[in-house]
Every structure is written in C-alpha cells, then in structure tokens.
Amino acid sequence: SENHQEVGDKANDSLRINGKQLRCKVIGEGGNLGFTQLARIEYAMSGGVSLTDFIDNSAGVDCSDHEVNIKILLNTLRKKKQLSEKNRSSLLHSMTEDVSELVLANNYRQVQTIALANYEMEFRNKEYAGLMSYLGQRAGLIRDLEFLPSVEQLEERAVKQQYLTRPEISTVTSYMKMYLKQVLINADYIDDGYLEKYLHDAFPASLAKRYRTEISKHPLRRELVATQLANFVVNLVGPSFIYRMVESTGASVSDVVKAAVMAKDIFDIEKYWLQIEALDYKVAADTQAVMMTRLTRLLRRSTRWLLRHQENVMGFAEAQSTFAREIKAIRKMFPQKLPPDFQEMFVEKFEGLVADGVPEELARDITRCEFLFSATSFIDISQTCGEKL
C-alpha cells in the first residue's frame, strides 16, 4: 500500500482512488503515470486486466525507433547521391502506414506474450521466482525498486491461488528483452547472413525490397538484429524461456537463442503461429492459447535437443538443410504411422480443437506438433545409419 505523500502528485490527491475500487474489467493506459505500479498490481490482484504504461505506450517509442533507423538509411543514400531530398521526403511520407503496421505488430506480440505467460503462471510460479533472481544478478533487476514480490511472497500468493500479475510480468518481460539485446550484440553469429531476414523485417517491406543491399550495410545492423532476435525469443516463447534453457542445459544465452532460431525455422513455427493469430475473435482466446502453448512446447523441446546434440557446431543454414525437409515428410506421416494408443490421443486432441471452431487443416497441423518432438532424433539416427526414414 502507499499514501498520497508516497505517490508524490499532490495536485491529484483529491481525485486519487485505490486500484481495487475500480469496477471496470480492463484498463488501457493512454498516458504515463496515471497509475502507480502498486495500484496496477492491486487492480490485477482484484481480478482486473491491465499491463503498464510503458507497455501500453510502447508503440510511441517503437515508432520513433523505426523513424530513426529509416532516416539513417535514407541519409546514407543521399550522401551517395542515390536519393534526392525531394524523393527522400516523399518516400518517408509514403511509408507512414507501413511503419504503423510494423509498430502495431510489435505491440500486439508483446502483449500476447504477457497474456500467455499469465495463462501459464499457475504452473511456472517457481520458474519466475528463479527468473527474477537471474535477472537481478545479470540485468540489474532490483525487486524492491520494481515492486516485484520476493520468493516468500510468491509462495504466499500460490497458497491463495494468486500468482505474478500482468503488470509484474510486463516488468520482467522488459528486463529480459534489454538483457538479451546486450548479450546478442556480441554473439559470434550476429553477422551471419542467415539472420538478414531479421534485419530486413525491421523495415517496411517496400523499403527492404528496394534497398536490400543498403539495409544489409546499415550502421546499426548488429543492434537491429540483436533487438529483433530478443523480441522474437521473448514474444514467441515467453520471458522465462532463456532462463529455463540455460538452467536445464548449461548452455550460454547466445547458444540458446541460436538453437531457438533453428528450431523455429525447421519446424516452421511462425507459419502456424500466424494462422492461429488469424483466428482472433473467431475462436475463444483460450483455444488460441492452447494451440500456442502446444507450439511453444515443441519449440522448447527441439531447442533443448539441438543444444544437447549439436553442441553449437551446426550453423543456421545447415540446420535448415539437415532437418526442415525431413520434418515436413514426418509431419505428413501422422497420425497414420503412430502407435494405436497415440492415434487415439491424436484424434481426441484434433477433434477437441475442431469442436472449438478451429479449421480442420490447422487443427490437424497443431495436433501433429504434439507428436513431432522426436523428429530430430529420427532424422539424426537415419542419417547416422545411412537409412531412409
């Protein structure tokens, strides 16, 4: 709890209320500092849905970042006399909607990962307790300063079936992204040509297509790729993923990210993730969450397998050529090639998704992911023995 003096905004003392007094179900903060962090947490603990001002307003900062990165590129083109001032201005104006789409996509994914983390929190309470200690040691996270609960307080909440709230998850998510970016800038693979797609995805598609070579030479190339990779990992697999992989495998942070990129691509995770997102407001959010957690489970398992079996020897392109085509072939074998009891399990999961309104093709693909985690082992054994699958 806190009093008016601790809030430090005397002009609004007569207007201020407590978070638990709000009767609305959802809060979105259009401005900064409308809530204190403790008020957000109190509101969330009372059943409300809220994030933080820096999450709700992240689009503003993101838009500025895109603008700066684009202007650096265009100024470089101007100096080389590849672009006139007039064309530069018109080009900037023409990209307004494209930049908006990029910004909103980032904002959407960030809120999505916080929601998914909240969805799974009952089963990951101890994991997040460890994560906060990990970030405290490596990323400068101070629990008291950020109003985050101690291990003991988390245990007390769990007894009451209360867990880390979305405002608290928002803080942890931000610290993990900042930490990852710092680590990845110095990763030995950050300049690998395979990762250029992450660099180009930071720019409007029309600009990336027109100035592909010039973007590849962007002065902030490493920073941009590191930022994109940090966003990919945290947004897709959650803020606790890196900590969990490091603790369970002993691998370095940069190696975990490398393996995660490989796993995402060889299993074509992004393709199915986008199809799930396309079902917004067409199926229940819980149904989408179930499908997304099935994909992230596959991604976690395959990342762990790559870390334990490849020992960082394999490159991005090699992983793609070694596994991707074979995994597609194995995927098509399911459920026919599964043992009878697994076939029954497959049908049950598949029919459950269809009953919840998921299109049959997507329901089948997502259900196949439940049984694909051994695919990399099958392929490895096949290639070692020189036998076809």
Name each region found by the language model.
Residues 2-389:
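Ligand/cofactor-recognition surfaces for anionic moieties
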